[in-house]
């Protein structure tokens, strides 16, 4: 039996789609030196090659893909978006605006200089900035811009062509820039990171190991009684001196949870909770020959929970003001916008931040109730909320505004982005509403993006040879300019106008470009994860601004003549 693969794929859109995805994802795992191609470029290359052979796909699949992707971008940005927009993220907001705004202006100028159409110009902007949200926003606006069918088809083909030709240029140039730009300025990045560490008293070790607290029991002997000198637990400050917390005391056979007024007596058996290294550093008066193994004394449920910051008495406070250790709890991680932050006592908490806290189950629950809520470790997605807000986003995108003979609307991209932000924001405020496991959200976002990339590649593939020969050199030059010049402008603005610490500034610059590989290079150069503070500050707002940039470039293009 002979199987005509070409006819089989042409006759089955679903089969063609998943063949493109499978081959593209395999290609995306290849590495060029230290650079991995990535899923997006892998799927795009395969779809362009198959598009050259005149394979095509139903445009409805393409539309659904970009809608799912942009909605999930909004959901991820939602918990931190408003706190960055309205409060102490002024510098980060300004940096993101400078980065995106300068790239937009430069792209418009180069597009007019080289005589490109809006499709090539917007695609070049998206590729040079390695930003799929720009591509999605521009594509959606083009479809709702009232072009005739043939002109629209050409613009969309050129959009994906411009993206394909400049994506690797943008990625490689930014990674190279992240490696060498810190060496060209007069302040050493490692020194800047250490300066912040000294000012804020935080750990500069990017590879800090995180242990769970353990519980061990000791009998109070004469040396320990002498060491306490009659002081109660509050006066002693056991945690400050030892790094351990007295969780239980057995006295005369009675087990109790001590308060701050308790005074240790000869023969008491105490349960200490702390990290392993804290137990190792205990004074010999605690340890030598004094450890006991008492089932009841050691029978404690030590848990680790992810606590979401929500309540007004925690939002806007510094981490040190929570006094977690005074309540017998230990902080392991601080996560903002899926980015792990340095544990810094001076970090100002935003609504939606996640604190990984360990300790006795009762104490962790008490802390969680005081500052927010324990994240639901559920694998069940609130599909009702997901679908309802998706519908709301589509309805917002249908709204149009009429000015004389000119009309414009938000479009599906902006509508879905706004609805996603609102769902993410409400989830951060109401623990039982709109829950979407991070794994499920990432899967839907990635799948939507891959479907979209497959669609645009198949659509543009037939014209890539002609386009590459005619404008390849121009695209190379434009891609380098749009990728690197806004980074330099952003650096000058942050260093000499905002006067930011260089470690935080370089992290914020990579966040404004939403480029994780470049962020890793900055952290390696600084030998610290302190730049992650800046990266998290600009990342969420940049995702939103980049989507809007895709819409704006299409809307202002006709007015430039």
Swiss-Prot record:
Signal peptide positions on this chain: none
Q: Which domain of life is it from?
A: Bacteria
Instruction: Indicate where this protein resides in the cell.
Output: Cell membrane
- Pfam families named in the record: Asp-Al_Ex, TrkA_C
For membrane topology, the record states: Multi-pass membrane protein
Where exactly are the transmembrane stretches of this chain? 8-28, 32-52, 66-86, 94-114, 158-178, 383-403, 406-426, 451-471, 475-495, 540-560
What's an example of a GO molecular-function annotation for this chain? Answer: monoatomic cation transmembrane transporter activity
Question: Where is the RCK C-terminal domain positioned along the sequence?
Answer: 200-288, 292-373
Keywords of this protein's UniProt record, alphabetized? Cell membrane, Membrane, Repeat, Transmembrane, Transmembrane helix, Transport
One of its GO biological process terms is: potassium ion transport
Entry GO CC: plasma membrane
Recorded hits in HAMAP family, A to Z, give:
YbjL
What does the sequence similarity comment in the record state about its family?
Answer: Belongs to the AAE transporter (TC 2.A.81) family. YbjL subfamily.
Q: What is this protein called?
A: Putative transport protein YbjL
**Organism whose genome encodes this protein:** Escherichia coli O139:H28 (strain E24377A / ETEC)
Gene behind this protein: ybjL
């Amino acid at each position: 039996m002979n199987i005509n693969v070409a006819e089989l794929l042409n006759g089955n859109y679903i089969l063609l789609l998943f063949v493109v995805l499978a081959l593209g994802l395999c290609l995306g795992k290849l590495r060029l030196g230290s650079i991995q191609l990535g899923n997006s470029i892998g799927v795009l290359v395969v779809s362009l090659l198959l598009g050259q052979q005149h394979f095509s796909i139903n445009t409805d699949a393409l539309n659904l893909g970009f809608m799912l992707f942009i909605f999930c971008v909004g959901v991820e940005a939602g918990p931190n978006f408003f706190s960055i927009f309205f409060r102490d993220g002024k510098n980060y907001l300004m940096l993101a605006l400078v980065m995106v705004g300068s790239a937009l202006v430069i792209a418009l100028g180069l597009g007019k200089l080289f005589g490109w159409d809006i499709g090539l110009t917007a695609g070049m902007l998206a590729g040079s900035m390695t930003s799929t949200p720009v591509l999605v926003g521009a594509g959606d606006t083009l479809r709702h811009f009232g072009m005739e069918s043939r002109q629209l088809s050409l613009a969309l083909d050129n959009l994906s062509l411009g993206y394909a030709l400049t994506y690797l240029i943008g990625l490689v140039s930014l990674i190279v820039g992240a490696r060498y730009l810190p060496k060209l300025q007069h302040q050493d990045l490692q020194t800047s990171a250490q300066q912040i560490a000294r000012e804020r008293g935080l750990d500069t070790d990017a590879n800090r190991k995180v242990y769970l607290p353990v519980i061990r029991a000791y009998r109070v002997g004469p040396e320990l009684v002498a060491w306490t000198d009659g002081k109660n637990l509050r006066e002693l400050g056991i945690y400050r001196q030892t790094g351990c917390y007295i969780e239980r005391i057995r006295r005369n056979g009675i087990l109790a949870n001590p308060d701050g007024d308790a005074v240790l007596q000869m023969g008491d058996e105490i349960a200490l909770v702390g990290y392993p290294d804290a137990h190792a550093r205990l004074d010999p008066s605690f340890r030598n020959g004094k450890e006991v193994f008492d089932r009841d004394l050691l029978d404690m449920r030590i848990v680790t929970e992810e606590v979401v910051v929500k309540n007004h008495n925690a939002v806007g406070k510094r981490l040190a003001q929570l006094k977690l250790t005074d309540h017998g709890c230990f902080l392991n991680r601080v996560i903002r916008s899926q980015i792990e932050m340095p544990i810094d006592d001076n970090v100002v908490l935003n609504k939606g931040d996640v604190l990984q806290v360990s300790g006795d189950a009762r104490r962790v629950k008490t802390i969680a109730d005081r500052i927010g809520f324990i994240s639901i470790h559920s694998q069940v997605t609130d599909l009702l909320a997901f679908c309802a807000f998706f519908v709301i986003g589509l309805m917002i995108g249908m709204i149009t505004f009429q000015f004389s003979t000119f009309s414009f609307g938000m479009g599906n991209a902006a509508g879905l982005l706004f609805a996603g932000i609102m769902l993410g924001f409400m989830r951060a405020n109401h623990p039982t509403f709109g829950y979407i496991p991070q794994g499920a959200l990432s899967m839907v976002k990635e799948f939507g993006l891959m479907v979209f990339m497959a669609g645009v590649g198949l659509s543009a593939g037939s014209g890539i040879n002609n386009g590459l020969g005619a404008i390849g050199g121009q695209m190379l030059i434009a891609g380098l300019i749009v990728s690197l010049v806004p980074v330099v402008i952003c650096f000058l603005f942050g260093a000499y106008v905002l006067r930011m610490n260089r470690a935080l500034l370089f992290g914020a610059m990579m966040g404004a470009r939403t480029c994780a590989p470049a962020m890793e290079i900055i952290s390696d150069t600084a030998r610290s994860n302190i730049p992650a503070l800046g990266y998290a500050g600009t990342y969420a707002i940049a995702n939103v601004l980049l989507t809007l940039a895709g819409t704006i470039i299409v809307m202002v293009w006709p007015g430039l003549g």
